[in-house]
Amino acid sequence: MTQTYADFHRRSLDERDAFWAEQARRIDWQTPPQQVCDASNPPFARWFVGGTTNLCHNAVDRHAATRPGDRALIWVSTEVNQERVYSFAALQAEVEAMAAMLVAQGIEPGDRVLIYMPMIPEAAFAMLACARIGAIHSVVFGGFASVSLASRIDDATPKLVISADAGSRAGKRIAYKPLLDEAISLAGHKPAHVLMVDRGLAPFERVAGRDLDYAELRARHWGQPVPCTWLESNTPSYTLYTSGTTGKPKGVQRDVGGYAVALAASMDWIFGGRAGETYFSTSDIGWVVGHSYIVYGPLIAGMATLMYEGTPVNPDAAVLWRLVEKYRVTVMFSAPTAVRVLKKHDAALLKRHDLSSLRALFLAGEPLDEPTARWIADGLNVPVIDNYWQTETGWPLLTVAHHIPGVEAVPTRLGSPGVPMYGYDVKLLDEHTGATLDGPDQKGVLVMAHPLPPGALQTVWGDDERFVNTYWGSVPSRQVYSTFDWATRDADGYTFILGRTDDVINVAGHRLGTREIEECISGHPAVAEVAVVGVADPLKGQVALAFAVPRETPATPEAALALEGQIMKRVDQQLGAVARPSRVFFVSLLPKTRSGKLLRRALQAVAEGRDPGDLTTLDDPTALAQVKTLLHK
């Protein structure tokens, strides 16, 4: 008899330990867990306590033992026109060789290894090699600016950095080594070694005694067996930095066992992936989707994972569909921004290739608007499934799960990412009182009750206090995990995400702290004060707009344009091009309350052409009038 999804979800909360004990059987354990969940020290939670396992074993070795010739990793680069296919046996050989290199450099369980690489197979080998030996990897998005990279080096204190000479995007080469060398010179912590993969794209200087050549060490260590190190389930597996509202980066810390179990269940129940099939996520390993659904998730499920270096429109706007046809992709994961880019091109390109293998397209990273969802669903003629989650959660928090045996499928609803997934105790709360909002269409903060399910963050790396205060201390009188997103829920239980409650904006799926951008801009000698807000953009979801008060008003329009260019260049250099505001407007004052608090939401509303609402606390009405005039020039 089929049960409703609501009943299934309720059981995952009411019979938590029994529910997750069943899911734990999806992976291999060297020693079985002694306790499913230790929630005795809220808000912390420990999953599968006492069990020992290994992410690399579950992703690679166990499949190599039974299906050595099956495809595991498919790498395609339209940037350098190369394709490589690795079987599970070949992938294990590459991972063991890299693990041997790390061990030879003195890397031990618990040591940190920072990975600053483009979308190349060696990046996946590096992550899996760290997992194999119990080192904690910290992947930083390739091409990240030196100042940002330096702050992550100081926070993670890696013994070793793995990098490459260059990445490439839309035909433009981005040299990584100068950025990395500058970051290390800026950082207080100095890694002992830098392991360099030389792609032959950009010449670089080697630092004697520090820099190591990957090809040379690979040849030296090839064929050297390195067994998996069995790790207690709650051992940290990796840290991944996410934007916060303050300048210091937040390292989301993930465990080993809970993460493996959560991914195994999600690959089956949410994505419907099957061993032997091909999964294609267009994300990057620098983001959480790349960790969960390029590297670990598909491989744990025994699928081939397609790793793509390139854009959705190079060499043409049919490139993704060509790959779906060639590699018989069954499940695809992308972002609404990528679809909006494709939407600018002829819809006939969607029909050019045989897409009969494709069962579903999942989209996440930013809100999915209805026109975009309809366009791609009509073009592909497969289900398009929105899903909402965060770096912190590690796997989808809201979506629709269509592959749970004996449980009725919840239909998709345009505009909503879906319903709470199993294991997540999701609530909407009043931000001022902490009261639970049970009625339909009430706006509240989207939160989760303790304990978070397996796969979610354990803590903030090296800063338990920040974990408790930031995530669990923002709602009055309630110790709940805040997503910092506004949401409503309709009468059928579908959640609708309304936007951020804090000052993080979402540009094409990249989460950026507005205050981080403000700090960068205010460091320019010509700028007295600045406010950055995220405004809706039809292509990127949101873009950053900066409103700066200059120390001296630019004398001419040309001078203003030159100063705007300098500010943008500064952001590029310190934070990376992804953080660059689309415009910098110069104003004589910013809209503030009489107590000096910046009226950020009013500024954002005016920038988006909306009613700014109650302005009774506004000190000087000319501030917003000035902004309106500038925007409508």
Predicted regions and their residues:
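Conserved pre-ATP/AMP-binding loop-to-beta segment of ANL
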Residues: 69-71, 194-197, 201, 205-241, ...
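Structural core segment of the AMP-binding/adenylate-forming
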Residues: 128, 132-216, 335-336
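Conserved AMP-binding/adenylation subdomain of ANL enzymes
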Residues: 260-278, 288-330, 344-347
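Gly/Ser/Thr-rich phosphate-binding loop
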Residues: 296, 303, 330-334, 343-412, ...
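Conserved ANL (AMP-binding/adenylate-forming) active-site segment centered on the GW(Y/F)…HTG consensus within
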Residues: 410-414, 454-484, 501-502, 514, ...
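Conserved beta-loop-beta connector loops within the AMP-binding
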Residues: 423, 427-450, 491-492, 555-564, ...
